[in-house]
UniProtKB/Swiss-Prot annotation:
It holds the Pfam family tRNA-synt_His. It is an enzyme of class 6 (ligase). Its EC number is 6.1.1.21. This is Histidine--tRNA ligase. NCBIfam families: hisS. One of its GO terms (molecular function) is ATP binding. It comes from Ectopseudomonas mendocina (strain ymp).
Amino acid sequence: MSKSLQAIRGMNDILPEQTPAWRYLESTLVSLLDGYGYKEIRLPIVEYTELFARGIGEGTDVVDKEMYTFLDRNEESLTLRPEGTAGCVRAVLEHGLAGGGQVQKLWYAGPMFRYEKPQKGRYRQFHQVGVEAFNLPGPDVDAELIVLTWRLWKKLGLADAVTLQLNSLGSSEARAAYRDALVAYLQERFDQLDEDSQRRLTTNPLRILDSKNEATQAVLVGAPTLGDYLDEESRLHFEGVKARLDAAGIRYQINHKLVRGLDYYNRTVFEWVTDKLGAQGTVCAGGRYDGLVAQLGGKATPGVGFAMGVERLVLLLETLDLLPAELNRAADVYVCAFGEAAELAALTLTERLRDELPGLRLLLNSGGGSFKSQFKKADKSGARYALILGDDELAGRVVGCKPLRDDSEQQSVAWDALAEHLAACQQA
């Protein structure tokens, strides 16, 4: 007996009963991004491996352990994208979108891929919405991105469920000086570090700061902090970000251990975290990457952005019961018809209603059946009303309009008055 085919572990189907929540989240965010002047860009999910090795950084967990990399038929190394910023920067460079200092505000959405241990809120194929801004070096756009995310949380009802953590990584020179000081401190306490942190001490020591190991965290209590090594320009930039967040009324926590897992960040970094999802608490994260464009072969170009995880945000909305109840309603109106002539008339009426009321979700019964069986399907669809068309209604050129969600009486409505009647019902 052949083995039944299944999805790859950690790569999940998003089923019809789940997609309304995804569409609700994505449409809410896209509406916000439009309002802030960000334009959509669509990017490949496969890039040359070199892009991520140069952009994300050798020695990072993402590049060393987590990428899906393979050789194509030309023996070229390709990788399923593990994140979106590097690919977006590549597109901006390739098409000259930021040439001559022109400002670009872009967003993209789609699947990312990392070989990680699958668990709730962490998958091998996961979906992100990413937002990037180029040629804006000041603290104002850093703050704008954070304010934008804050507005999204308020729209979704999540404002009390998330906390903003904020830090500045300073310039590359300041970060290098801090790196040396941190390494010197930790080398003296090498035996007290967990095995993973011992390895990172030579490959990516800043990542030790967000170790989840309790013994390592105890060692870090007395470690030097990034704030002690900030250059003056970065300090003023960070003060500018904080001043704007204060003016917008957005609360934040300074987290000197917040470094982010990708090498390209400098100056502002931030994360929105929640305590409602256990270990997978980061729902949105980003920061400034002023050196990345040059690192990938372009002219020095300021950049800043963020990405948010769709799966985690949907999970958070579900956990807190914040999804609108009507999301699971397949239709507003279910059209029932019995008899061949009635079915033909129902088709004509339904299509006319689609023209006259384009926002109305109409589900025309398929597969025949008695009125009793059709009413069961109408109820299951979540529709608020059933339209009934049989021989009697056909003869009188009327339609029975039956409320399904309250005790109101069924009404007979003339065909020509049906659109007006349903529009009024929707407003009620």
